[in-house]
């Protein structure tokens, strides 16, 4: 899972995560086999750290979101991305969450299954007709719903779903009935840990799995994150909410690539891209640039146009500009504007160089503005 990132600047997060949680995260990412990763205590930690490595690399390019959302565990990544949680708190909460869910899975054994090709309301009918402990756990996309509960309950609801017209019912290799009342003990255990982390208010809202609404007040997340464990993930509704808020471009960060397909199925005309490895960063830069438009902004009756772009530092260190790059120089996507130490400063945008903001020899910090561009 993590091998492509070895040697990349963002790999430093792996060492930080190991120090925080007292586990060898590098070994988990590089040496753990598929069977061991089925253990939710391993899967959640490795997925979270992997996603944060991708996020860190993307932030070094100066690319920032308007909204964030994450599916299940991914909600912790989204909250860390917006600054609601620090990286330290994110790691600690993910470890606590995984352990709580593992224990709940032992005390209340259960399973999950994906129901394909059946409307949401019919899947809900199937769960009710099963007359057993089974519920909808994930509303992923149109015709893609996950159910969870007791082994007998999931089997019974799956059979009813097929009778109602489901194209396929696929058992999932999981260690519990997540996002159902079977996780009540985990929910109660996690609530205090989240409150103790004191999530912060954020400028960038996060769309909650529980209610599919945008939230940026830190004090709301103790109840939302804990409730998420025993409530269905309303992912389809989160996507619809973002679309209604004007989002047209969706970037999936981290291993898997599954959410990109869900966005395409749910939002007509959505632009999507998935980024999981360093090799895909250049592709992301090109994708972002292809979607750049001059967006009119209403300011006191006048139309201004959002064409200004800042290129930021990918790392801390001493800045050295490219010698022949001057004001008025035409910049393409990926053009090298200079170096910060050994790290190249590449422009994620096309445009015309207006000025360098950092001067030669200046010691800069990560994400400090380096240059100012005006988009073509």
List PLM regions with ranges.
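Acidic, low-complexity mobile loops and tails
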Residues: 296-355
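Short, well-structured beta-strand-loop connectors
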Residues: 74, 326-339, 360-370
């Amino acid at each position: 899972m993590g091998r492509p990132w070895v040697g990349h600047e963002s790999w430093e997060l792996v060492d930080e995560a190991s120090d925080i949680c007292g586990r060898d995260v590098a070994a988990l990412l590089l040496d753990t086999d598929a069977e061991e990763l089925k253990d939710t205590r391993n899967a959640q930690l490795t997925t979270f750290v992997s996603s944060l490595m991708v996020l860190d690399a993307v932030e070094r390019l100066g690319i920032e979101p308007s909204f964030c959302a994450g599916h299940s565990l991914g909600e912790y990544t989204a909250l860390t991305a917006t600054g609601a949680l620090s990286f330290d708190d994110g790691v600690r909460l993910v470890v606590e969450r995984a352990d709580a869910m593992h224990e709940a899975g032992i005390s209340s054994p259960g399973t999950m299954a994906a129901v394909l090709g059946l409307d949401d309301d019919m899947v809900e009918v199937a769960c009710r007709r099963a007359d057993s402990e089974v519920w909808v756990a994930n509303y992923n996309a149109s015709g893609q719903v996950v159910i969870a509960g007791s082994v007998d309950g999931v089997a019974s609801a799956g059979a009813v779903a097929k009778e109602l017209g489901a194209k396929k019912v696929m058992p999932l290799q999981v260690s519990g009935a997540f996002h159902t009342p079977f996780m009540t003990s985990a929910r109660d255990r996690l609530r205090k840990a989240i409150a103790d982390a004191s999530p912060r208010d954020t400028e960038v809202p996060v769309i909650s799995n529980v209610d599919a609404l945008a939230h940026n007040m830190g004090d709301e997340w103790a109840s939302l994150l804990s409730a998420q464990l025993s409530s269905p993930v309303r992912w389809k509704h989160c996507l619809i909410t973002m679309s209604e808020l004007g989002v047209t471009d969706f970037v999936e960060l981290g291993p898997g690539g599954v959410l990109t397909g869900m966005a395409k199925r749910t939002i007509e005309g959505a632009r999507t891209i998935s980024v999981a490895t360093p090799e895909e960063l250049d592709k992301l830069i090109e994708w972002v640039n292809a979607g750049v438009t001059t967006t009119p902004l209403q300011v006191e009756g006048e139309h201004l146009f959002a064409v200004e772009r800042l290129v930021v530092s990918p790392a801390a260190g001493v800045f050295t500009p490219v010698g022949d790059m001057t004001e008025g120089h035409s910049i393409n996507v990926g053009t090298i504007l200079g170096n910060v130490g050994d790290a190249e400063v590449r422009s994620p945008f096309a445009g015309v160089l207006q000025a360098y903001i950092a001067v030669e020899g200046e010691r800069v910090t990560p994400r400090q503005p380096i240059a100012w561009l005006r988009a073509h």
